[in-house]
Amino acid sequence: MTVYADNAATTRMSRTALDAMLPAMEENYGNPSSLHSVGQRAAELLMKSRETVARCLNCQPREIIFTSGGSEADNQALLSAAAIGRRKGKMHIISTAFEHHAILHTLKKLEKEGFQVELLPVHENGMVSARQVAGAIREDTCLVTVMFANNEIGSILPIEEIGAVCREKGILFHTDAVQAAGHLPIDVQAQHIDMLSLSGHKFHGPKGVGALYVRGGIPLVNVIEGGAQERGKRAGTENVPGIAGMAAALEDACAHMEENRVKVTALRDRLIQGLSKIPHSAVNGDLEHRLPGNVSFCFEGIEGESLLLLLDAAGICASSGSACTSGSLDPSHVLLAIGRPHEVAHGSLRLSLCEWNTQEEVDHILREVPRVVEYLRSMSPVWKDLESGKKAFML
């Protein structure tokens, strides 16, 4: 049996997405900027896809910019907000300590350009409050960027409350919704969101395509220079097949969101309950405000990479954190942000489920993870020191 439990890293593309993409490659293959009929058919498909994404977010189609993915959308949002702030003499940006690296690395770049970046501390349950955001706002704050839901530990942030604070203060609010889109209700109007990033491959769409929502009237900085595509805000011939697939996948995910949430949450909770029985283990993230498919644990006395390799040999595909940092010897910055010690953070496991996972697959995980953890601990000198009392248990 092979169990794919790494859906936070990427998802298998749905038949709905594939069926939307094939006509764009076989029939409507023209350049949407061309004036002839084949090009105009592609342009029409592009327009319909934009309308679909806009409906799912409750915004206007003209407020959607198609990108190559979430990272590009994040970069364009932050650089655009920074440019607005620089013109107004406002050089203070608020974010959190456990954002995706697409946000954190861009903020580092802006720091080198003279911006002051304030990273709010994260509570041990993986939450940041609207009160924290309100308390950090200054006269020279130009942007607040807070992720909708964390990719590693699954905590869902109070986006509507944070958005309301920013709207009241007249400060731009961006959210990285890459993990939330297609899984959680998003309404950019009700949630007071000015800019939002999403990525198609997180909800059974294709890789290499994403979108940036930008509230009307907010000027954008071009990250890619060239032609006049995307209203002159994102150069390069649009990836029409990818965009069509992403739009179809998002529409399908939103249509079945509640039934998927109920099914996946039940699988998640069963996994959390079963894995919690392993001695000296701990769940990461908030148990109530949590992505439906996210299961994140730390196991004391083991190393996460060894755990992943042995689980893979047992047919279980998982991760020890973000796939974007796979292979790094450093512990997860997310786990460190919620207060996990280095030695504990190294023994992390993330299982991320979707509606295609089954009870039988959960049974397999619940058999194999305890077995592998016990096996690794039996060989670990760190575990022996913990058992002998030379070192104190932390979990």
Where do the protein language model's features map onto the residues?
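Pyridoxal 5′-phosphate
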Residues: 1-395
